[in-house]
A protein has these predicted regions:
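A recurrent flexible, glycine/aromatic-enriched loop bordering the glycosyltransferase active site
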Residues: 118-135, 197-200
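A conserved acidic beta->alpha catalytic loop
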Residues: 19-28, 46, 76-77
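Conserved donor NDP-sugar-binding/catalytic core segment of glycosyltransferases
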Residues: 81-114
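Short beta-strand-to-loop acidic/aromatic patch adjacent to the donor-nucleotide binding site
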Residues: 66-77
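Non-catalytic, C-terminal membrane-associated alpha-helical segments of glycosyltransferases
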Residues: 217-273
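Short, well-formed alpha-helical segments that are part of the catalytic scaffolds
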Residues: 1-9
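Glycine-rich, basic loop-to-helix element that forms the pyrophosphate-binding segment
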Residues: 44-61
Length: 273
């Protein structure tokens, strides 16, 4: 992951890395690198979740007066000219003042394919990953921060829906390419049907099922068509999990537990999964 730092530093004015509960041994190379490369390192004593880590990074930028933030997961890599292309696309957008989140084209490094974003009528993505997004810091003052009680999974989906519900837009920069991978995809088959499950952990299956349900309940009457499409995509992805992955018993248990907690609104970090 340290190799992802120089390409980002070459394109931004400042960089902050938020660590979620790594051991002293794991942190040592990051502590050394931040002194060499001149970036900030926020060290959380425990895993507070991706949403809280993103919020910490955004607050760090806001306190320093930065008008924009560029957000990344730990396993995403940017290409040359990424940020310049982002700003070019934003400036040439038909309504730049309403654009609350700029997104790249995604190239899956595990599968060697480019991800296709479902587009809304305005030409922007309906939802998109937070990783790789360029966002003006004013949007967080307008509609709030990322939902820390989600902990992980669907944090980006919920925020994209919140952006659109508030009347703002998402847009794509076609010349900005983000290299990433989702889960640990491996090809599988069932009754002669070949497919590629993501092989997310059993822990993630809990948060995925819970948070998806919470998002659907909140936005089904605001964006019914988009939510129904997301539900369909989620059902296909979940079916691939239970037909082609290992540890299906525990994953099914966590899926059902997440569904139950989503129905009753139990949020936050869940222990003993």
């Amino acid at each position: 992951m340290l190799s992802n730092v120089p390409p980002v530093l070459n394109q931004v004015n400042a960089l902050v890395v938020v660590d979620n509960g790594s051991t002293a041994c794991e942190l040592a190379p990051w502590q050394a690198a931040c002194k060499i490369h001149g970036f900030e390192l926020i060290q959380n004593a425990e895993n507070l979740g991706i949403a809280e880590a993103l919020n910490q990074g955004v607050h760090w930028a806001q306190r320093r007066g930065f008008p924009w933030v560029l957000l990344f997961d730990q396993d995403s890599k940017i290409t040359d000219g990424y940020l310049e292309a982002m700003f070019t696309s934003w400036k040439t957008h038909s309504d730049p003042d309403r654009v609350a989140s700029m997104h790249p084209l995604y190239k899956d490094t595990a599968m060697g394919v480019e991800g296709v974003l479902r587009r809304a009528e305005d030409g922007g993505p309906i939802v998109a990953m937070t990783s790789g997004a360029l966002m003006p810091t004013w949007i967080f003052d307008k509609i709030g921060m990322f939902r820390a009680d989600y902990f992980v999974d669907e944090v980006d989906t919920e925020y994209c829906f919140r952006i659109r519900a508030a009347g703002y837009l998402l847009a794509v920069s076609p010349a900005s390419v983000l290299l990433h991978h989702i889960g640990h995809p491996r090809k599988s088959s069932f009754l002669g049907l070949r497919f590629t499950p993501t092989h997310h952990s059993a822990l993630r299956r809990y948060y995925m099922s819970r948070n998806r349900l919470v998002v659907y309940k909140k936005y089904i009457w605001i964006f019914p068509r988009w939510v129904l499409q997301s539900m369909k995509d989620s059902m296909v992805e979940t079916a691939k999990c239970f037909l082609g992955e290992e540890n299906r018993g525990r994953k099914l248990r966590n899926f059902l537990l997440g569904t139950w907690d989503g129905l009753r609104g139990r949020m936050g970090k869940r222990e003993n999964l």
